[in-house]
């Protein structure tokens, strides 16, 4: 991601990361994770998709990594989140 953007705009990955964090207050990776988790939360609430299907739809190939990432952000597992809503 950063490689593509840095080549496209002719700036270093370091500078691009620095500017992104300055503008948005978070790293590119954290921003992407938060966007994925936000989309996953929507799918958990409004679809009947399985956790594996949701993980794949939001860009995770490994469902266990998705569950760990979700729990790190939301402090509950995707399954617990779905039951809550």
Spans of features found by a protein language model:
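Acidic/proline-rich low-complexity IDRs
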Residues: 1-4, 42
